[in-house]
């Protein structure tokens, strides 16, 4: 079975009121387009084609060589957008997934189930649908008395009966690839919006007595299409819940999960304790047995097992096992800490390596320094590393005791 994918990402997203293309707004650290593309990978597409338009170079840069791209110059509807992909997929045998790039909550599991349903039922087209308590604004699924899908009608074109229907079109489909592009040649703009509706191919298939099916999502949240900042916030809330629940299932304890922000690519080992108001972003890894107390903020960093981070900020740093940091410490980019290092309150470290079992208990700045092991850095110590033009390295040997301002270019030997 050969699968293909078309991702619709050409729209501007006027209701977002933003210079940024809609699909590039982020949910839990990844753009919506990245979330969709990761889910699409679950069906192992032989080829993925992304339809781009508004600020196309920015959109293209997100996926780079992971996808082929086609350009939709004019925004003439979803049917027109899919037509643009014909140059990439024309004549190919297989099944083509069509999905919008603004649906970040759709899961790979659901897309795989959709494909399996489509193949097992030998459909020419399968619509991913959901049951909505308030279906206003969505296209409705219209079935006959035998339960067969006969058409999809958009909100603006729906009659009174159709507007009462609760089963809605999520905007995700699977088609027989060849039949999709053949049917697209038959659709028109004869509708309330004057656009080429992709949904019109359903009526064409039905007129030819070809089989059209619908696979109903179990979780309505997955159907969310983000068109404004309100929906973006809703997507963020749902994604945050998913992420914290995933980590809890894998052995992480959250004292107050509703207040924690963890991005999609963060890795957390079992037996980590996370208190409230903790933020973990980017490519961060937290080792087993670590405790992150209230207010801790970590970005793109590796925290070794058994460490304790107390109400501190850590950026692009690497900490070995058994390190203690805080409260109110700041580890800036380029910091590495050896095993069992202690960085105390109101200590700032930048671009420095600190050897194992060294202690800097309070009120200290260590910048561009190489500090040995088992060093005691006393209160008020500052490595003066900047002369107004250049920065210089300070070297402090093992077992040294330091408690003063250190001018740049200094080297202090080991004690013992």
Curated annotation (Swiss-Prot):
<dbReference type="Pfam" id="PF00132">
    <property type="entry name" value="Hexapep"/>
</dbReference>
<feature type="region of interest" description="Pyrophosphorylase">
    <location>
        <begin position="1"/>
        <end position="229"/>
    </location>
</feature>
<feature type="binding site">
    <location>
        <position position="350"/>
    </location>
    <ligand>
        <name>UDP-N-acetyl-alpha-D-glucosamine</name>
    </ligand>
</feature>
<dbReference type="GO" id="GO:0003977">
    <property type="term" value="F:UDP-N-acetylglucosamine diphosphorylase activity"/>
</dbReference>
<keyword id="KW-0677">Repeat</keyword>
<keyword id="KW-0460">Magnesium</keyword>
<feature type="active site" description="Proton acceptor">
    <location>
        <position position="362"/>
    </location>
</feature>
<dbReference type="InterPro" id="IPR005835">
    <property type="entry name" value="NTP_transferase_dom"/>
</dbReference>
<dbReference type="GO" id="GO:0006048">
    <property type="term" value="P:UDP-N-acetylglucosamine biosynthetic process"/>
</dbReference>
<dbReference type="GO" id="GO:0008360">
    <property type="term" value="P:regulation of cell shape"/>
</dbReference>
<feature type="binding site">
    <location>
        <position position="332"/>
    </location>
    <ligand>
        <name>UDP-N-acetyl-alpha-D-glucosamine</name>
    </ligand>
</feature>
<comment type="pathway">
    <text>Nucleotide-sugar biosynthesis; UDP-N-acetyl-alpha-D-glucosamine biosynthesis; N-acetyl-alpha-D-glucosamine 1-phosphate from alpha-D-glucosamine 6-phosphate (route II): step 2/2.</text>
</comment>
<keyword id="KW-0479">Metal-binding</keyword>
<feature type="binding site">
    <location>
        <position position="169"/>
    </location>
    <ligand>
        <name>UDP-N-acetyl-alpha-D-glucosamine</name>
    </ligand>
</feature>
<comment type="subunit">
    <text>Homotrimer.</text>
</comment>
<feature type="binding site">
    <location>
        <begin position="77"/>
        <end position="78"/>
    </location>
    <ligand>
        <name>UDP-N-acetyl-alpha-D-glucosamine</name>
    </ligand>
</feature>
<dbReference type="GO" id="GO:0009252">
    <property type="term" value="P:peptidoglycan biosynthetic process"/>
</dbReference>
<feature type="region of interest" description="Linker">
    <location>
        <begin position="230"/>
        <end position="250"/>
    </location>
</feature>
<dbReference type="InterPro" id="IPR050065">
    <property type="entry name" value="GlmU-like"/>
</dbReference>
<dbReference type="InterPro" id="IPR029044">
    <property type="entry name" value="Nucleotide-diphossugar_trans"/>
</dbReference>
<keyword id="KW-0808">Transferase</keyword>
<keyword id="KW-0573">Peptidoglycan synthesis</keyword>
<dbReference type="GO" id="GO:0019134">
    <property type="term" value="F:glucosamine-1-phosphate N-acetyltransferase activity"/>
</dbReference>
<feature type="binding site">
    <location>
        <position position="102"/>
    </location>
    <ligand>
        <name>Mg(2+)</name>
    </ligand>
</feature>
<feature type="binding site">
    <location>
        <position position="379"/>
    </location>
    <ligand>
        <name>acetyl-CoA</name>
    </ligand>
</feature>
<feature type="binding site">
    <location>
        <begin position="8"/>
        <end position="11"/>
    </location>
    <ligand>
        <name>UDP-N-acetyl-alpha-D-glucosamine</name>
    </ligand>
</feature>
<keyword id="KW-0012">Acyltransferase</keyword>
<dbReference type="InterPro" id="IPR011004">
    <property type="entry name" value="Trimer_LpxA-like_sf"/>
</dbReference>
<feature type="binding site">
    <location>
        <begin position="385"/>
        <end position="386"/>
    </location>
    <ligand>
        <name>acetyl-CoA</name>
    </ligand>
</feature>
<dbReference type="InterPro" id="IPR005882">
    <property type="entry name" value="Bifunctional_GlmU"/>
</dbReference>
<feature type="binding site">
    <location>
        <position position="154"/>
    </location>
    <ligand>
        <name>UDP-N-acetyl-alpha-D-glucosamine</name>
    </ligand>
</feature>
<protein>
    <recommendedName>
        <fullName>Bifunctional protein GlmU</fullName>
        <ecNumber>2.7.7.23</ecNumber>
        <ecNumber>2.3.1.157</ecNumber>
    </recommendedName>
</protein>
<comment type="pathway">
    <text>Nucleotide-sugar biosynthesis; UDP-N-acetyl-alpha-D-glucosamine biosynthesis; UDP-N-acetyl-alpha-D-glucosamine from N-acetyl-alpha-D-glucosamine 1-phosphate: step 1/1.</text>
</comment>
<keyword id="KW-0511">Multifunctional enzyme</keyword>
<dbReference type="GO" id="GO:0000902">
    <property type="term" value="P:cell morphogenesis"/>
</dbReference>
<comment type="function">
    <text>Catalyzes the last two sequential reactions in the de novo biosynthetic pathway for UDP-N-acetylglucosamine (UDP-GlcNAc). The C-terminal domain catalyzes the transfer of acetyl group from acetyl coenzyme A to glucosamine-1-phosphate (GlcN-1-P) to produce N-acetylglucosamine-1-phosphate (GlcNAc-1-P), which is converted into UDP-GlcNAc by the transfer of uridine 5-monophosphate (from uridine 5-triphosphate), a reaction catalyzed by the N-terminal domain.</text>
</comment>
<feature type="binding site">
    <location>
        <position position="365"/>
    </location>
    <ligand>
        <name>UDP-N-acetyl-alpha-D-glucosamine</name>
    </ligand>
</feature>
<comment type="similarity">
    <text>In the N-terminal section; belongs to the N-acetylglucosamine-1-phosphate uridyltransferase family.</text>
</comment>
<feature type="binding site">
    <location>
        <position position="227"/>
    </location>
    <ligand>
        <name>Mg(2+)</name>
    </ligand>
</feature>
<dbReference type="GO" id="GO:0009245">
    <property type="term" value="P:lipid A biosynthetic process"/>
</dbReference>
<dbReference type="GO" id="GO:0071555">
    <property type="term" value="P:cell wall organization"/>
</dbReference>
<feature type="binding site">
    <location>
        <position position="139"/>
    </location>
    <ligand>
        <name>UDP-N-acetyl-alpha-D-glucosamine</name>
    </ligand>
</feature>
């Amino acid at each position: 079975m050969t699968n293909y994918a078309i991702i619709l990402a050409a729209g501007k997203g006027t209701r977002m009121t933003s210079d940024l293309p809609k699909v590039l707004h982020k949910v839990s650290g990844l753009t919506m387009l990245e979330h969709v593309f990761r889910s699409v990978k679950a069906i192992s597409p032989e080829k993925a084609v992304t339809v781009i338009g508004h600020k196309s170079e920015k959109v293209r840069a997100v996926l780079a060589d992971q996808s082929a791209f086609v350009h939709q110059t004019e925004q003439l509807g979803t049917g027109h957008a899919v037509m643009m992909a014909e140059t990439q997929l024309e004549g190919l045998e297989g099944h083509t997934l069509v999905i919008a790039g603004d649906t970040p909550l759709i899961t790979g599991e659901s897309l795989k189930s959709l494909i399996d349903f489509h193949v097992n039922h030998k459909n020419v087209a399968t619509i991913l649908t959901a049951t909505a308590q308030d279906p206003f604004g969505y296209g409705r699924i219209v079935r006959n008395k035998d339960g067969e899908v006969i058409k999809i009608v958009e909100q603006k074109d729906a009659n009174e009966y159709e507007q009462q229907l609760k089963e809605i079109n999520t905007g995700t489909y699977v088609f027989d690839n060849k039949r999709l592009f053949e049917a697209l040649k038959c659709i028109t703009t004869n509708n309330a919006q004057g656009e080429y509706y992709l949904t019109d191919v359903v009526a064409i298939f039905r007129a030819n007595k070809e089989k059209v099916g619908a696979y109903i999502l179990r979780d309505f949240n997955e159907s969310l299409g983000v068109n404004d900042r309100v929906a973006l916030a809703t997507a963020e809330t749902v994604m945050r819940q998913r992420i914290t629940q995933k980590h809890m299932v894998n052995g992480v304890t959250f004292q107050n999960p509703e207040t924690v922000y963890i991005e999609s690519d963060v890795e957390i080992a079992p037996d980590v304790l996370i208190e409230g108001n903790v933020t973990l972003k980017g490519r961060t890894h937290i080792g087993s047995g670590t405790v992150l107390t209230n207010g801790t903020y970590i970005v793109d960093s590796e925290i070794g097992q058994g460490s304790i981070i107390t109400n501190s900020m850590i950026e692009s740093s690497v900490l070995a096992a058994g390190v203690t940091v805080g409260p109110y410490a700041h580890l800036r980019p380029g910091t590495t800490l050896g095993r069992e290092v202690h960085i105390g309150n109101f200590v700032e470290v930048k671009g420095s390596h600190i050897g194992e079992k060294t202690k800097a208990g309070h009120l200290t700045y260590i910048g561009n320094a190489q500090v040995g092991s088992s060093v005691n850095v006393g209160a008020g110590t500052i490595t003066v590393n900047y002369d107004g033009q250049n920065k210089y390295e300070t070297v402090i040997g093992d077992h040294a005791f330091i408690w003063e301002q250190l001018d740049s270019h200094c080297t202090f030997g080991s004690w013992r």
